[in-house]
Amino acid sequence: MRAIRVRTGPGAFQYQIVEGLTPGVARNKLKAMFRDFVTAIKGTGGLILIKTTPGNAAGVASLIDRMNEPKVLGTVAGDDTILVVVDGEDQRADVQREFQNLL
């Protein structure tokens, strides 16, 4: 079972199941999580580094994967850092801009 931590109010969080999410629903959840947890986005080459608040990288990365974005090959998440591998350096700026627009 896959679960992610989501904000339910000021200082309040709960875990929600992410199995079976459509890309549209995943995008809405991802936007909320970016606003709540992402602190920085930087890119170089075909890689994007996303910094989150501690303990939230895995949940954000899981939703990025569920977006089924063809330009994104995959993600690797630690505690507060996500590495997004993009399909080619030329695609990175587009994907990074999409992530910035979620903030």
Model segments located where?
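N-terminal helix-turn-helix
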Residues: M1-R5
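Non-DNA-binding regulatory cores of transcription-related proteins
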Residues: P23-Q96, Q100-L102
